[in-house]
Amino acid sequence: MSESNYLCFMDDDDSWAPEYVSRLLSVLANIQSTYSSVNAIACHTNKVAEIAENNRIIINSTQPWNHYLNAGPVSFDVIYYRNSIPLSSCLFDKNSVIDVIESHKLSSPAFFWPFFIHYLAENDVWILPEALAFYHFRENDDFEFGNYTVINNELFDIECKIAENKMMRSIDDSSLLN
């Protein structure tokens, strides 16, 4: 694990603006000085539709993904919809992640959404309304060039449901049933 005080997760086909890390770190430090429960920050994301051909990526379009999210703390209502906050748009205080992440399978295509629900049950996440992350969607449907989660959508749905059910059965997360 990183020696840093912060942690980001990056999908292999997603990308960040050059100022992503410095901007999120700066804003998170300012927010934490006022709201100590905020231990992570997520920025707006742009969806990039692309095709992979041989050694080239052809971008077909770029459009806002979650620009409807306002500055401030994320509410549970927002994360009711899967992928409203992509994994690669978040920066976490590492210490706030350690206990939460242990009960989630990092290699699962369904890792982030159940993890994020569990994380939000214990911490606040701040939205920075600046598009600094890019959520790439490969329009290819083959395993070599396509998106793993899209290609394995059935496995994603199954693992998501199992992770959600496990959280709902947990005494610690029973408040999520209300």
Where are these regions (language model features)?
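Hydrophobic helical membrane-anchoring modules
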Residues: 139, 143-177
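Nucleotide-sugar donor-binding/catalytic module of glycosyltransferases
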Residues: 1-154
